[in-house]
Structures are given as C-alpha cells and as structure tokens.
Amino acid sequence: MPVPRISKEELKQRLEMSGGPLLLDVRLKYPYEHSTVKLPGALRLLPQGQLDTSGIPKDRDIVAYDSDPDELVSSRVAAELIRQGYRASALKGGIVEWLTANFPIETKEALRSAPPAPGSLK
C-alpha cells in the first residue's frame, strides 16, 4: 500500500488550523546537520534503526519530512507509523519544496526534541 503524501500547500493550511498535524523532521544526519532551519514546531526523529513510537500520540495526524525530493526517508518512517496504527503521511518534495515556496520556517535552535526514548528511532 502506498504511503499517503501531503502537498506543501495542504500542510501549510492544516498547520494554520487548531490541532494541526505533528511534524517529524527525519532528515538524514548530513543534510540535517548542514541546515539551520526546520518546519515550525517539528520534532527531530533520527531516521535510523527501529522506530519506537511510545511517545508519539496516536490521536494526531503525523507528517514526516526529509530533504529528499522523492521522500525516501520520510515515506519509510510514515509507512512504519501506519503499520503501527498511526495516521501518517510524507511531505511531497520534503523541506526543499517547502523552502522553495517561502513557507514559514524556524531556526533549529527552536527545535523541540522528542523524549529521549519514547518517540525516537533506535
């Protein structure tokens, strides 16, 4: 079953509404470390190993994004979340498309971390 993908325009609209989706920044190490920005309110989740979702709420939609225009990493994470019963999708075009559209961003200093064990990839 293909992983649902959400457009940057639809995600922007949903983030402006109350109860918008939870964003997961799942960029690989190098692209993440060489960037100074992220999507607003995103949690950092290392996209390696087995996904531990114990700290991720099941009552929210989740959108994973990466820096790959083909959403390879974010699709893998979203597929695993769906397998575990979450409502998850991948951002079409990743953060690159988001930045190209000049949509809102935050500096990584504002990055909120997921709890160390719950919600992290091991």
Give residue ranges: language-model regions.
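Rhodanese-like catalytic fold shared by cysteine-dependent sulfurtransferases
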Residues: 1-17, 21, 29-63, 68-122
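Active-site flanking residues adjacent to catalytic metal/cofactor-binding acidic residues
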Residues: 24
